[in-house]
Regions:
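C-terminal transmembrane-bundle signature of multipass membrane proteins
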Residues: 164-233
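Aromatic-anchored segments of alpha-helical transmembrane domains
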Residues: 40-48, 107-117, 186-200
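Membrane-interfacial loop-to-transmembrane alpha-helix junctions, especially the N-terminal start
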Residues: 27-41, 96-104, 176-187, 228-232
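Hydrophobic transmembrane alpha-helical segments in integral membrane proteins
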Residues: 1-16
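Non-cytosolic membrane-interface motifs at loop->transmembrane helix junctions
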Residues: 58-70, 131, 203-211
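Internal transmembrane alpha-helix with an interfacial aromatic "cap," most often the third helix
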Residues: 15-24, 44, 48-60, 70-104, ...
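Juxtamembrane "helix-exit" motif on the non-cytosolic side of transmembrane helices
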Residues: 25, 49-59, 115-125, 193-200
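Membrane-proximal helix-loop-helix units in multi-pass membrane proteins
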Residues: 83-164
Length: 233
């Protein structure tokens, strides 16, 4: 069941990648090109989980897993820059100032620096959960592959994803209230909800990643095709 679920997530993320690539080719928006990088690895992340039971634990799956973690630490917060760029596209005067866009970029870089030590301090471990065979950053009682497998890793507070989610929601709320476009806010909100324990235990947080990315890309598509009237804020 969950293997199929991740395969579907991978296909949805692939559809978003193709859509974003098309948006970039049609509009030449730099932000669309920038976001293609994390979007590619969202496809990668879901599909490497989906094929885990086929490959089994071993060197191949181990090395297919690492790029997902590297991309998460390095580019997972680039949607913050996307949020600032979308506000510009939507005609918000304040977002046209260099200092404002610089603030979005500064927050992004700060979060990247925050996660930088993960590249040499974190490790990944074989885990078994439901029908999934994969590698993860920690092993808990619920994800042991055998009874005497040692518990390992630690669950750090996901600062970069949480900040990214709230920035996207904040920008999305501005779009909803001033431009009548609710989808970026709703995508961020559903991402936040899906990452809470009642939903994350059923792997719905990966669906939340589809929704937050989809809401942002929809905003890029929408505001590059509409004559954005200036909005003062």
């Amino acid at each position: 069941m969950y293997t199929t679920q991740f395969f579907i997530y991978g296909l949805l993320q692939l559809a978003l990648f193709v859509w974003l690539l098309r948006i970039h080719r049609e509009t030449r928006q730099p932000v669309a090109l920038l976001l293609l990088v994390p979007q590619f690895f969202l496809v990668w992340d879901n599909l490497r989980v989906a094929i885990g039971p086929l490959l089994g634990h071993g060197e191949l799956l181990y090395w297919l897993t690492w790029p997902s973690f590297w991309a998460h630490w390095f580019a997972g917060c680039w949607l913050i820059i996307g949020a600032g760029a979308i506000l510009r596209m939507a005609g918000f005067d304040f977002a046209r100032h260099r200092a404002v866009m610089g603030a979005f970029c500064t927050v992004t870089v700060a979060l990247m620096i925050h996660d930088l030590p993960n590249f040499w301090t974190e490790d990944i471990y074989p885990v078994c959960e439901y029908d999934l065979i994969r590698y993860a950053g920690s092993v808990s009682e619920a994800t042991r592959c055998f009874p005497d497998q040692a518990l390992a890793g630690s669950n750090h507070f996901p600062l970069a994803p949480v900040v990214t989610c709230f920035v996207v929601m904040g920008a999305g709320l501005a779009l909803w209230s001033r431009r009548g476009f609710p989808w970026m806010f709703l995508g961020g909100l559903l991402m936040l909800i899906s990452a809470t324990p009642p939903f994350a235990r059923y792997k719905l947080d990966n669906l939340g990643e589809v929704l937050i990315a989809g809401g942002a890309y929809w905003a890029i598509w929408h505001f590059t095709r509409s004559a954005a009237r200036p909005v003062r804020a």
